């Protein structure tokens, strides 16, 4: 099958879910608009903020590109884990553990540098401006605390899902971040530090940032958020495409299935 035929087939596979996502965004905008109008009629002070639509031309491009990233991703369940180039970000909670000593803040490294031959590596991809990702960070922290005796954990900070100067989302909660598009590696690392200031992670969790060529994002087909588990340099678990298929409960189930309760408590 030629490349043109493959591209056409992938496009036809993407179209139904793409249109369903567009419908969801339209419904979301309708609900928010009705809520906004109701607050205006009630003369509530909470209506002073700007109303932002989600169904925009830039939003459609982002959604479409996210499906393309997922379709063309290199990572496959049971196959070799891509050893993407990343940049180390210091975790304020980390002490002088072995990983921190080997990798200085801002130093270039590779994703599999954090993998152990005997322990699985849980890799969590996301950014501060992705609400589904930030909402799950407390659950991710709990996973690290409960399973760090049997597994290693890595957070990979990627390109912003909803930068304030791009496809921004309404800032209506304490989880909201105002982060612009990353112009350079320093911007990306600064955004990662901003996330860690709001959501502290246990010292057992290492943090890195994707390079500006987004090689980790492309290899793992992340787009918005994704989680996977690497074991013996193979993909032992591959989570679905975020936001709708991003599921940390599946990670917990995998860890519980593969490790006894006694080992976890140890």
UniProtKB/Swiss-Prot annotation:
One of its GO terms (biological process) is positive regulation of cold-induced thermogenesis. It comes from the Eukaryota. One of its GO terms (cellular component) is endoplasmic reticulum membrane. Predominantly monomer. Can form homodimers but homodimerization is not essential for enzyme activity. Interacts with USP20 and USP33. Interacts with MARCHF6. Residues 35-266 are cytoplasmic. GO terms for molecular function: thyroxine 5'-deiodinase activity. Residues 1-9 are lumenal. Belongs to the iodothyronine deiodinase family. Expressed in mammary gland and in brain. The lineage of its organism: Eukaryota, Metazoa, Chordata, Craniata, Vertebrata. InterPro entries: Iodothyronine_deiodinase, Iodothyronine_deiodinase_AS, Thioredoxin-like_sf. Its EC number is 1.21.99.4. PROSITE patterns: T4_DEIODINASE. Keywords: Endoplasmic reticulum, Membrane, Oxidoreductase, Selenocysteine, Thyroid hormones biosynthesis, Transmembrane, Transmembrane helix, Ubl conjugation. The active site is at 130. SUPFAM superfamilies: Thioredoxin-like (SSF52833). Plays a crucial role in the metabolism of thyroid hormones (TH) and has specific roles in TH activation and inactivation by deiodination. Catalyzes the deiodination of L-thyroxine (T4) to 3,5,3'-triiodothyronine (T3) and 3,3',5'-triiodothyronine (rT3) to 3,3'-diiodothyronine (3,3'-T2) via outer-ring deiodination (ORD). Catalyzes the deiodination of 3',5'-diiodothyronine (3',5'-T2) to 3'-monoiodothyronine (3'-T1) via ORD. Catalyzes the phenolic ring deiodinations of 3,3',5'-triiodothyronamine and 3',5'- diiodothyronamine. Ubiquitinated by MARCHF6, leading to its degradation by the proteasome. Deubiquitinated by USP20 and USP33. Its main location: endoplasmic reticulum. It catalyses: 3,3',5-triiodo-L-thyronine + iodide + A + H(+) = L-thyroxine + AH2; 3,3'-diiodo-L-thyronine + iodide + A + H(+) = 3,3',5'-triiodo-L-thyronine + AH2; 3'-iodo-L-thyronine + iodide + A + H(+) = 3',5'-diiodo-L-thyronine + AH2; 3,3'-diiodothyronamine + iodide + A + H(+) = 3,3',5'-triiodothyronamine + AH2. This is Type II iodothyronine deiodinase. It is a single-pass type III membrane protein. It is found in: Endoplasmic reticulum membrane. Pfam families: T4_deiodinase. It is an enzyme of class 1 (oxidoreductase). The chain crosses the membrane at residues 10-34.
């Amino acid at each position: 099958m030629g490349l043109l035929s493959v591209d056409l087939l992938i496009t036809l596979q993407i179209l139904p879910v793409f249109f369903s996502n567009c419908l969801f965004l339209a419904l979301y905008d309708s609900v928010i608009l009705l809520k906004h109008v109701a607050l205006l009629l009630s003369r509530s002070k909470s209506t002073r903020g700007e109303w932002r639509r989600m169904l925009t031309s830039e939003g459609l491009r982002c959604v479409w590109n996210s499906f393309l990233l997922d379709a063309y991703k290199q990572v496959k369940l049971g196959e070799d884990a891509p050893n993407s180039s990343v940049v180390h970000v210091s975790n304020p909670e980390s002490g002088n553990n072995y990983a921190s000593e080997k990798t200085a803040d801002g130093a270039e490294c590779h994703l599999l540098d954090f993998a152990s031959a005997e322990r699985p590596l849980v890799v969590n991809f996301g950014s501060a401006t992705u609400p589904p990702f930030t909402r799950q960070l407390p659950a991710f922290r709990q996973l690290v605390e409960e399973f760090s005796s049997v597994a290693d954990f890595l957070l990979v900070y990627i390109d912003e899902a909803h930068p304030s100067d791009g496809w921004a989302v309404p800032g209506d909660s304490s989880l909201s971040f105002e982060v612009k598009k990353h112009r350079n590696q320093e911007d990306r690392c600064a955004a990662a530090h901003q996330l860690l200031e709001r959501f502290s992670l246990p010292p057992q969790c290492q943090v890195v940032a994707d390079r500006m060529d987004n090689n980790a994002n492309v290899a793992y087909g992340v787009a918005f958020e994704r989680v996977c588990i690497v074991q013996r340099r193979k993909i032992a678990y591959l989570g679905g495409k975020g936001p709708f298929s991003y599921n940390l409960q599946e990670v917990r189930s995998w860890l519980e299935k593969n490790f006894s309760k006694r080992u976890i408590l140890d």
